[in-house]
């Protein structure tokens, strides 16, 4: 099995239930074992900022799926939970991003690994640092990348 890291986000409806539902779907998928989950974090919107706040989390999984197979599973879980893609960086009931996949560097029209923006987004790095602070992405650890960003406005939800 290969270790991969996923970012979860929601800003429509019952955000906590959406994140929990995504993790449940992942855990029920053959070839995926959820090994760690961060707390949920309340975060301001990024990109298109005229929308509600987000709830974000990170998940570590062990998987037998290929990177593209994992992406397809994530997209199918999003659809099962009601995701409709209307505009880039717009509101979403659930978002599941493949952030990193151990030993894989991918760059094609469907998938870029590691995720091209992972080191630029505190809302991704804060929860990821909770479960994998020493994960190396782009030559630096998650902890080092996070130290370069401003995490203000990001609050852990108890």
Swiss-Prot record:
Annotated pathway: Cofactor biosynthesis; tetrahydrofolate biosynthesis; 2-amino-4-hydroxy-6-hydroxymethyl-7,8-dihydropteridine diphosphate from 7,8-dihydroneopterin triphosphate: step 4/4
Organismal lineage: Bacteria, Pseudomonadati, Pseudomonadota, Alphaproteobacteria, Hyphomicrobiales
EC number annotated for this UniProt entry: 2.7.6.3
Organism the protein comes from: Methylorubrum extorquens (strain ATCC 14718 / DSM 1338 / JCM 2805 / NCIMB 9133 / AM1)
Protein name: 2-amino-4-hydroxy-6-hydroxymethyldihydropteridine pyrophosphokinase
Function: Catalyzes the transfer of pyrophosphate from adenosine triphosphate (ATP) to 6-hydroxymethyl-7,8-dihydropterin, an enzymatic step in folate biosynthesis pathway.
One Gene Ontology term of the molecular function aspect: 2-amino-4-hydroxy-6-hydroxymethyldihydropteridine diphosphokinase activity
Keyword tags: ATP-binding, Folate biosynthesis, Kinase, Nucleotide-binding, Transferase
Catalytic activity: 6-hydroxymethyl-7,8-dihydropterin + ATP = (7,8-dihydropterin-6-yl)methyl diphosphate + AMP + H(+)
CDD domains xrefs: HPPK (cd00483)
Gene Ontology process terms (BP): folic acid biosynthetic process; tetrahydrofolate biosynthetic process
Keyword Transport: no
InterPro entries reported in the protein's UniProt record: Hppk, Hppk_sf
Family assignment from sequence similarity: Belongs to the HPPK family.
Domain of life of the source: Bacteria
Keyword Metal-binding: no
